[in-house]
């Protein structure tokens, strides 16, 4: 049976919009920093709390991996924020669809985002020795979306929906 439309729910809508806004803000900060090396973003609180330094690092593009695997000029070697915008839009759209494949894609994309969040958090703390407020907030949003996606599969007493 095909997928049908439904409301994504207020929590998913709020999380996706917050993630999208933060991803767009990260793109803005990265672009402003590229134009002006002295640019100071609102999220740049100090030397060890600097989102613009994180966004401008080699790990702020293609997760620090794409350039080494596919080359610097690969179309996939984009700012991580671009992937964030795509992810949060996809989460919102898939959250509006009712159907088995939409549910599977929703949960699978959440798990991928969770793995990416753990990887980037490790880079943030143990390689860059930084604290990025925007980054940490997006990781929390990704955890929230993952929890929400798996909760939607179960009914009120923990029973799987539709069974």
Swiss-Prot record:
Coiled-coil zones: none
Keywords: Disulfide bond, Endoplasmic reticulum, Membrane, Oxidoreductase, Quinone, Redox-active center, Transmembrane, Transmembrane helix
Reaction catalysed by this enzyme: phylloquinone + [protein]-disulfide + H2O = 2,3-epoxyphylloquinone + [protein]-dithiol; phylloquinol + [protein]-disulfide = phylloquinone + [protein]-dithiol
UniProt entry tagged with the keyword Nuclease: no
Transmembrane segments: 10-29, 81-95, 101-128, 132-153
SMART domains: VKc (SM00756)
Cytoplasmic domain ranges by topology: 1-9, 96-100, 154-163
Protein name (record): Vitamin K epoxide reductase complex subunit 1
Lineage of producing organism: Eukaryota, Metazoa, Chordata, Craniata, Vertebrata
């Amino acid at each position: 049976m095909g997928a049908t439309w439904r409301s994504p729910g207020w929590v998913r809508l709020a999380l996706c919009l917050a993630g999208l806004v933060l991803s767009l803000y990260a793109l803005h900060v990265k672009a402003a920093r590229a134009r002006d090396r002295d640019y100071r973003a609102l999220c740049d609180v100090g030397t060890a709390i600097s989102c613009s330094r994180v966004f401008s690092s080699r790990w702020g593009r293609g997760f620090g991996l794409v350039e080494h695997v596919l080359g610097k000029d690969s179309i996939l070697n984009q700012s991580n924020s671009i992937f964030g915008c795509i992810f949060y839009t996809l989460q919102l759209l898939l959250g509006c669809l009712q159907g088995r494949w939409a549910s599977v894609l929703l949960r699978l994309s959440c798990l991928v985002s969770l793995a990416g969040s753990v990887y980037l958090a490790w880079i943030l703390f143990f390689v860059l020795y930084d604290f990025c407020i925007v980054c940490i907030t997006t990781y929390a949003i990704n955890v929230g979306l993952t929890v929400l996606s798996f909760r939607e599969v179960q009914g009120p007493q923990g029973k799987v929906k539709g069974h």
